[in-house]
Amino acid sequence: VVAVYSQPLIVDSSITPTEIVQNTLVGSGITPTNIKFNKSLSNALITRDQIGVFTNGQGTNLGLASGVVLSTGQVQYAGGPNNQNGASHPTLIPIANDADLALLSSNSIQNIATVEFDFVSTGTEIGLDFIYASEDYPEYATSSFSDVMGIFLSGPDIAGPYSNNAKNIALLPSTSIPISTNSV
């Protein structure tokens, strides 16, 4: 019998949210501005334990080799195992409200991790690969604890029910159902 183990994600939270957006989240041909982390321009200029970049994804079942990780807890524990005291809570006081995320859940939002920015693209199309994971899944699926995910896009010719007429593009495949621990 040969046992093969996945290699853990490598997570780096020593980079500011602004640097993460500029150097990892957006690609060539996209210029981001007005970068905010948890509703604040100044929060985006210092390192935070709720956002980081990951590498070594090819050693896991994620389907992405590298990218950005957001957490309502501490991203350093994102690779698991899920056995760390305090991993579910950021070291700073979390922000607990977001009008758009609140529309995605019938339950109250307890804490959030948000990155917001404006961008201009030189192309006619943009793409984004994302993966949703929750420490609350599957233990709290169909309960009053419901982690939600939203990716809100607004701009010319976009008309949606969220702030700035945005649409949520974080939906279950081929549906209009928002992604949450209660919907996956």
Predicted feature descriptions by range:
Residues 4-184:
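Aromatic (Trp/Tyr/Phe) and Gly/Pro-enriched flexible surface segments
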